[in-house]
């Protein structure tokens, strides 16, 4: 859902705290942070700037089943040793047929998958029924785990909730609109076995200016691209800890794939970057059988065009000048 705007009194506290931090008055900054948190908000620093987030709502137990108030409440497996080969994450919201079809296709056609995580993102009633049926009938191998939320999360946060439960070394984010008809997971894992590759998937996009992105030429076969389309998007689980989490300002799917592709490829996106490290690659896979039945489903209502613009500005805020990340500008 669209991010809630903090009350003016909380924003004033945050502004005062930012000034204190710039002045290195840490005691005052800590006191102001405590006041912000007491008002029910969290402040997240980004350099000399900040973001305000409503504190995560409480988890809710319904009929003995825990529904998480936010992604941060979901117990994380990201620090555990990897298990299996590929974890698939599906986010279910309002399309019952899509989640049933996509999950069934993964189980039937992708033997490389070792775990499926379904995020039941405060779904519609018929979707909740389908998910319950999946839980009851899903095979033990690969296991299917359902993460339920107490409220409708934005797209980025919903994916974060699923990512926190992933156990395998490779993660495949799969939109329910996609029906795999072959072992897409195996193809993604094979591509990511190359340490120079950061992200892989069946649809790739390229750009000459970081403002407009176009599908890569189909005739090119498997090739390097700038961005992998978010409908089917694979990367290493270890990068979630090193470079994540996903930015939950992306409340709809639009442009989150662009942002995360560039974060994964950017040699400066880690805590201790190595001088001279190369830009990592995004690889568009060729001849991977999958059918996309519709566009990505938005988890939120509201003015989609306005939300898309805000999401794109989020990309530009970080990467507008990073021409070095574009395949077209390789030496």
Task: Write out the residue ranges for each language-model feature.
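C-terminal, non-catalytic tails of nucleotide-sugar-dependent glycosyltransferases
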Residues: 68-81, 198-199, 208, 233-234, ...
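A recurrent flexible, glycine/aromatic-enriched loop bordering the glycosyltransferase active site
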Residues: 216-235, 251-253, 300
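Short aromatic/hydrophobic "clamp" motif used to bind/position activated sugar donors
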Residues: 171
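A conserved acidic beta->alpha catalytic loop
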Residues: 120-130
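Conserved donor NDP-sugar-binding/catalytic core segment of glycosyltransferases
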Residues: 182-213
């Amino acid at each position: 859902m669209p991010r809630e705007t903090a009350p003016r009194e909380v924003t004033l506290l945050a502004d005062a705290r930012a000034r204190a931090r710039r002045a290195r008055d840490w005691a005052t900054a800590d006191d102001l942070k405590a006041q912000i948190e007491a008002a029910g908000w969290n402040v997240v620093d980004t350099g000399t700037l900040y973001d305000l987030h409503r504190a995560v709502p409480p988890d809710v137990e319904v009929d003995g089943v825990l529904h998480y108030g936010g992604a941060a409440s979901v117990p994380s497996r990201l620090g555990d040793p990897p298990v299996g080969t590929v974890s698939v994450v599906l986010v279910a919201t309002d399309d019952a047929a899509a989640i049933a079809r996509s999950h069934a296709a993964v189980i039937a056609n992708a033997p490389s998958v070792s775990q499926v995580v379904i995020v039941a993102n405060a779904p519609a009633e018929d979707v909740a029924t389908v998910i319950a049926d999946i839980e009851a009938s899903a095979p033990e191998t690969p296991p299917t785990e359902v993460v339920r939320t107490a409220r409708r999360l934005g797209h980025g946060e919903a994916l974060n909730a699923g990512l926190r439960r992933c156990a395998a070394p490779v993660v495949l984010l799969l939109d329910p609109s996609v029906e795999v008809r072959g072992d897409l997971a195996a193809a993604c894992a094979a591509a990511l076995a190359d340490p120079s590759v950061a992200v892989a998937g069946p649809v790739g996009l390229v750009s000459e200016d970081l403002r407009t992105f176009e599908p890569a030429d189909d005739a090119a076969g498997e090739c390097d691209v700038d961005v992998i389309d978010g409908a089917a998007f694979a990367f290493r689980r270890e990068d979630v800890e090193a470079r994540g989490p996903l930015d939950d300002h992306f409340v709809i799917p639009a442009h989150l794939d662009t942002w995360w592709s560039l974060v994964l490829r950017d040699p400066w996106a880690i805590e201790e970057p190595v001088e001279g490290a190369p830009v990592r690659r995004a690889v568009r896979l060729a001849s991977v059988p999958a059918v996309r039945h519709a566009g990505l489903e938005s988890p939120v209502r509201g003015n989609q065009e306005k939300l898309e613009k805000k999401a794109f500005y989020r990309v530009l805020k970080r990467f507008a000048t990073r021409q070095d990340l574009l395949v077209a500008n390789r030496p």
